[in-house]
Every structure is written in C-alpha cells, then in structure tokens.
Swiss-Prot record:
PANTHER family: ATP PHOSPHORIBOSYLTRANSFERASE (PTHR21403:SF8), ATP PHOSPHORIBOSYLTRANSFERASE ATP-PRTASE (PTHR21403). Signal peptide: none annotated. It is found in: Cytoplasm. Its cofactor is Mg(2+). It is an enzyme of class 2 (transferase). This is ATP phosphoribosyltransferase. Its EC number is 2.4.2.17. Feedback inhibited by histidine. One of its GO terms (biological process) is L-histidine biosynthetic process. Pathway: Amino-acid biosynthesis; L-histidine biosynthesis; L-histidine from 5-phospho-alpha-D-ribose 1-diphosphate: step 1/9. InterPro entries: ATP-PRT_HisG_long, ATP_PRibTrfase_cat, ATP_PRibTrfase_CS, ATP_PRibTrfase_HisG, HisG_C, N-reg_PII-like_a/b, N-reg_PII/ATP_PRibTrfase_C. Keywords: Amino-acid biosynthesis, ATP-binding, Cytoplasm, Glycosyltransferase, Histidine biosynthesis, Magnesium, Metal-binding, Nucleotide-binding, Transferase.
Length: 298
C-alpha cells in the first residue's frame, strides 16, 4: 500500500515511548496522543505515527510496511538474526543513534559465584529473552549451552531452578542485586536508533526524512550543549579561551566604558563543571552564565 504520508513506527508503551514522542515534538512534529489509537496523524506534517510493540518494529521496517522506526539496538539485532535464520527479509538502513535508551545486554550469575570467562558457562542453561544474541555471542566464544526462553521476569530463573545464569537488559544493576545476581559479562551495548526501510521512497518522503534528520541533529546537539557567557580581562583572554571547550571560536565583544574587559559568548559541546568555573573566576572572569539551548542548526 503506497501513501504519500511518512509512516513512523514507535513503541506504544515502554522505556522508549515517551522519549521518542518528546524527540518528535521538539523536532516540530505536532500530534495528539489522546486515547488508545494505534495510528496517530500529525497535525502539521504529512506524518503518521504507528504505535506498536517494540518487537514488531524491526519486522515492519524490514517488510517495508513503514518508512521509519525508532527501536533499541538490542531488539533490532535480535529480530534481524531471527528473521535471517528463517530466510526472511532482514535488511534496513540505520540513519542514526539517538541520545536515549541506553542499556546493556549482560550475562548475570549468582552473586557468590566466581566468573573467569565465557568458558565457565560451558554446558550451562541460560535464561533469556534474547536467544539469538546469546547464541551469537556464545558461538564466537566457542561455548555450547542450552537456552531457557522467557518473555519476562528473567532474573528469577536461577532462584526458581530454571537456569544456571541469565542474559538480560541491565541499566543500573539494581534488579540483579535484588535477586541475588551479579553482572558477569556485557555482550551488547544498546541505544535507541532511527532506522529506515530499504525500499525506494518518493522524493517528497525522502526530503521529509532529510528535514527530520536535520532537526533531530539540532535537538540532540542542543541537548548536549550549553551557551556560556562571561566577562573576561583582556590580558587573560587567551588563557580563559583555552579552558572553554567550544563548538566554534567564541564571540568576543567590547564592554561599554571598560577597555580592560570583554564579553565572551560561546556554545560549549562539553559539560562545564564547577571546577572549570572556579578556574575561570581565578583568571578574573566574572558574570559567568551557563544556559541550556533549546534548538541548534549549523
């Protein structure tokens, strides 16, 4: 089914849903998420959002049902391996990593057990929701094992006698600790990514995707940057500039009725820590302001 409206699949509920919606809104895409609708139409752009389960998104992209999707790399790679094993289409274009959805897929074992490496898992039973990723990792390590497939509450498997170890997503490790487990090995580090189907799109759709990518770059870069303003003595200007990690050279402006000091403005692409601000003050800087940036375009 061909449509001139850009179709974007996003997670209906879960850890990526809200941040994905926030990103699209900051990119200027207006939509109303009220109700339990599965398809939401943008109010100001030819864009439709499809709200689906996260594990459905890769297949929708790979089958060409939707144009774009936002998905965690862990789910994307798991589904891709699964489809490839069934000789189903598994191609996609990865447009960019996003600035949310950070997690890692890790093997965890009993907190009192000793772990010397993957060979310790030889012949063991591993509970996981990601059997394909675990198999890929174990095959590379030359380790044979058996899988206990679970779709939830993976961390209780060892205590219930279902498995010797688990492989699951970890953010802080608190859930592992609460269940008497410890992280033994990271097999994948994951973030949310924006992906595109491999089908040839109309010029209008591709132009809209390019616009969205430019806006996403601006939103993400703005989130990671700060606008810094300060007054600096002219005789220490070069020393002060060396302390400021800028995206470009700073703007230096004269101050009215003061020839010995200037105003310095710049966009910093790195965090300005308290220690740096204290160093700036020691060099004679004053009126130091660090401000958030809402949008950027280079």
């Amino acid at each position: 089914m061909q449509t001139q409206r850009l179709r974007i699949a996003i997670q209906k509920k879960g850890r990526l849903s809200k941040e994905c919606q926030d990103l699209l809104k900051r990119c200027g895409v207006k939509f109303n998420m009220m109700g339990e609708r599965l398809v939401v139409h943008s109010e100001n752009m030819p864009i439709d959002l499809l709200l689906v389960r996260d594990d459905d998104i890769p297949g929708l992209i790979m089958d060409g049902v939707v144009d774009l999707g936002v998905i965690g790399e862990n789910e994307l790679e798991e589904v891709g391996l699964e489809r490839a094993a069934r000789n189903e289409p598994s191609d996609y274009k990865k447009l960019r990593r996003l600035d949310f959805g950070d997690c890692r897929l890790s093997i965890a074992i009993d907190k009192d057990a000793t772990y010397n490496g993957p060979q310790d898992l030889q012949g063991k039973r591993i509970a996981t929701t990601y059997p394909q990723l675990v198999k890929r990792y174990m095959d590379k390590q030359g380790v044979t094992f058996s899988t206990c497939m679970l779709n939830g509450s993976v961390e209780v498997a060892p205590r219930a006698g279902l498995a010797d170890a688990i492989c699951d997503l970890v953010s802080t490790g608190a859930t592992l600790e609460a269940n008497g487990l410890k992280e033994a090995a990271v097999i994948l580090r994951s973030k949310a990514v924006l992906i595109q189907c491999t089908a040839e799109l109309s010029a209008e759709k591709q132009a809209l995707i390019d616009r969205l990518l430019t806006r996403m770059q601006g939103v993400i870069q703005a989130k990671e940057s700060k606008y810094i303003m300060l007054h600096a003595p002219t005789d220490r200007l070069e020393q002060i500039k060396m302390l400021l990690p800028g995206a470009e050279d700073p703007t230096v402006l004269p101050l009215s009725q003061n020839n010995n000091r200037v105003a310095v403005h710049l966009v910093s692409t790195e965090n300005l820590f308290w220690e740096t601000m204290e160093q700036l003050k020691e060099l004679g800087a004053s009126s130091i302001l660090v401000l958030p940036i809402e949008k950027m375009m280079e």
